[in-house]
Amino acid sequence: CNCDPNSPQITEILQNRIRAIEDDLHSYKSKSWDEVMRLRDLARKVAQEGKASNRAMWYYTAAYLTDLDGDTQTASNLLSKAEAVQGNDYIKESIMVLRIYLNAKSSIYNAKYEEKLLRQLRWLDNKIKTNIDDRVRKATCEGFDIKYNRSYYYWNDMLRKIVFSVIAPRYIEQGNYTRAIQLANMADNNLLNIVNKQTAVFEVKNRWEE
């Protein structure tokens, strides 16, 4: 690849490429695995060379694709390097989401981890609350996207992915069905509850001002 790692367009290009890879990997005719590996190796190379100004993004990309390849421990190590270098707010938030996901996959589910998990889920819940816009409110109230598990709001999508694909199954494996059900219910209903509360407050405020 002859791309400039410091190009202003590189973030968008990487995001679009990863999204395309994800979509293709879920099809029966997927031929993208070689591309995944090439992109992973490129990301690691660029990050380790130290010439890119946005090394956090490259380490994050390498970590994400390494986990996609099934190597969670190496992915976690790469993500630690992403956490250690400077990045903008967007990439810091992306790193945090991936850290929650990797921790959920690799941690021993004991009291110490549950304390950390609670802090992480509170952080994610705050992102859900503070980034809601009218489009999200409308889609949530209509209910179709949630009912059919469609992706439409990044922060809530990540909460559902982490809980449904990793955390709840891990709790079920260790026989903690109550905690699995509690968290699954939270992930399934959290956004709707938030939107309903915000809508109720908005309506009361409007009536008060009339």
Task: Label the predicted regions.
Residues C1-E210:
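Extracytoplasmic/secretory-pathway proteins
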